[in-house]
Amino acid sequence: MYRLTKGDDYILLIVYVDDLLYIGSTDNVTTWFEGELQKDLTLTVSSIVTQYLGLNIQEEEGTIYLNAAKYADTIAKRFALTPTTISTPYRYTAGNDKAKSAPLKPAGIRNYQRKLGCLLFAAVTCRPDLSYSASQLATYLKRPEAEHMAELDRALHYLVNTPTIGLIYYKNITTTPKLIGYVDADHAGDPDNRRSRTGYIYRLEPIGPISWQSSKQELIALSSTEAEYIALCSATKEGLYLRELLEEAKLAQLSSFSLFCNNQSAIRIANKNGFANRTKHIALRYFFVKDEIEKGRLELSYCPTSEMAADYLTKKLGKLKFEYCILLTGQSHVTSSDTPEAKGSVGNN
């Protein structure tokens, strides 16, 4: 994102190849900016944006809806995906057993990589509910097996069969925005190397979700508390970045941000008297989070696991908990006249 200032006015600009998306603080600066561009470029200007990079954008009074319905329809045609009835992007089992199946041949590997790229795009743009699956499947990008391809196909079927799930944002807000994050970790959940997984999501309240991530931790966590604290450090860094970005873009002036964690031991470690011999090897992370709390830029609070919005970013969940997390994070079923009909239905699988 770029920011251009002209006096007291400014333009926020996003560029992808030859597609520009911009907004001005006033109509005058927007008109001036378009005039400057048209001096050197031939532009097709649309004052009402309904699509951008395959995403549907629907604006109504007080709300903006974002989904990947058109993109999902394209994926269905590209990979000839047939209708199915599923409610999650993965097969839920009590444990994450290591896959044991035949490795794919070179042609299969290339197909796996193409499909995964499509899934990743949806996951990072407007489908946080796909983030865990996309991140986990990316682990096998170079040497996927038949079991991984089956899981990838299921995730794509889920995307195609739930095209109206997207993000909802509220505009014309009169209250002061607040940056609120939720962070979670799954200890030693990877069946291949027992690495833990970090998941976090940030919402600009009461507007909507603005950032999320599901990623494997670089360190081997020796306990669930340690895994949660490593995740807490990653989420704190993202919160600081978002706070500065919002201020620079003049979208919000925030003195601090809030972060909710469901591990009370990790919260105690972040406080003044939480450091101990068993946490010496994560000392830098400890002092980083502790310093942000003492400076008043981070407000760390407890959230029960039952209300942890980031839970579906770290592990496989059953149908009911998975759908509840979708609601907690601010995702919604978004429908419009331009939304292709679902190729199937969500069921109990």
Go through the PLM ranges and name each one.
Residues L119, G181-T225:
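RNase H-like nuclease fold core
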Residues M1, D18-L20, F33, L37, ...:
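Mobile genetic element proteins and their domesticated derivatives, centered on retroelements
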Residues M1-V17, L21, V29-T31, D40-V49, ...:
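Active-site palm subdomain of RNA-directed nucleic acid polymerases
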Residues S47-L167, P304, L313:
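C-terminal reverse transcriptase regions that engage the nucleic-acid substrate
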Residues M1-T5, Y10-V17, G95-L116, I180, ...:
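Short, conserved non-catalytic motifs in the polymerase core
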Residues L4-L41, N56-N67, T139-A146, S265-R278:
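Catalytic palm subdomain of template-directed nucleic-acid polymerases
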Residues H157-A185, Q253:
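Structured nucleic-acid-interacting core domains from mobile-element enzymes and related host factors
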Residues Y140, K178, E218-N349:
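RNase H-like nuclease module associated with reverse transcription
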